[in-house]
Amino acid sequence: MTKFLGPIAGFGVTFSTMFKKSNTEFYPEEKVPTAPRYHGRHQLNRYADGLEKCIGCELCAWACPADAIYVEGADNTDEERFSPGERYGQVYQINYLRCIGCGLCIEACPTRALTMTNEYEMADDNRAGLIYEKDRLLAPLEPGMVESPHPMAPGATAEDYYRGTVTGGAAAAAQDESEVDDTAGDRP
C-alpha cells in the first residue's frame, strides 16, 4: 500500500503548486528598480561648474582589496585646469573583471569624487570592454557645467569648491570671460 501512496503524495505536491501564482521576475523585459543605496557601476563626480572632483591621490586604488583601480595623477596648470586642487586624475581605470563591489574605494575618497550608481547592467562579450576608462566613468555634464579643462570660477578658492559654494553659472561666466579675453588680442 505504501508503494502506491508514495507517488501519489509526490503528485499531490506538484498539482497543488501548479495553480499557485509564480514568483518569477521577467527580468530583461520588466526591470525591477534597485534599492537607493545599491552598489552598481562607479561614477567620477564633478563640481557644479564642471571641474572634476578627483584630485589623483590614489587612495581609492590603495583601499581596493581586489586591486581593480588604477590611477595616475598629474599636476594642474593655469592653462589646463581639470580640478580645483593642485592635481587631478589624468588616467583613471576600473577593471570590472576584478571589482567585487565592496565600496571601500568610496569610503577612502577624501573629496567624494567616486560614488556608485544604481546601474548594474555592465555585461560585455569582450574582456577589454569591462575595463572602464575615465571617459566612461565621468558623470555627464548638467546644464550650467562647462567641460574641463577650464579656469576656476572668478574669486573662488579650492576651499570654496570643497565646501560646495561654487555654482555652475560662475564657471560659465568664467569661461565666457576667458573666451572674450582670447578674442580681444586678435583685434587690430
UniProtKB/Swiss-Prot annotation:
Q: Which GO terms describe its biological process?
A: aerobic respiration
**InterPro entries, alphabetized:** 4Fe4S_Fe-S-bd, 4Fe4S_Fe_S_CS, NADH_quinone_OxRdtase_chainI
Q: How is the cofactor bound?
A: Binds 2 [4Fe-4S] clusters per subunit.
Superkingdom of the source? Bacteria
Give the catalytic activity: a quinone + NADH + 5 H(+)(in) = a quinol + NAD(+) + 4 H(+)(out)
What's a Pfam family this protein contains? Fer4_7
Kindly indicate whether the keyword DNA-binding belongs to this entry. no
Bilayer topology: Peripheral membrane protein
- One MF term in GO for this entry? 4 iron, 4 sulfur cluster binding
Transmembrane regions: none
The terms describing its cellular component in GO are: plasma membrane
**Residues involved in [4Fe-4S] cluster 2 binding:** C64, C99, C102, C105
Which positions are annotated as binding [4Fe-4S] cluster 1? C54, C57, C60, C109
Q: What is its main location?
A: membrane
**Role, per record:** NDH-1 shuttles electrons from NADH, via FMN and iron-sulfur (Fe-S) centers, to quinones in the respiratory chain. The immediate electron acceptor for the enzyme in this species is believed to be ubiquinone. Couples the redox reaction to proton translocation (for every two electrons transferred, four hydrogen ions are translocated across the cytoplasmic membrane), and thus conserves the redox energy in a proton gradient.
Name the family.
Belongs to the complex I 23 kDa subunit family.
**Record's subunit section:** NDH-1 is composed of 14 different subunits. Subunits NuoA, H, J, K, L, M, N constitute the membrane sector of the complex.
| Name of the protein described by the UniProt record | NADH-quinone oxidoreductase subunit I
The organism is Rhodococcus jostii (strain RHA1)
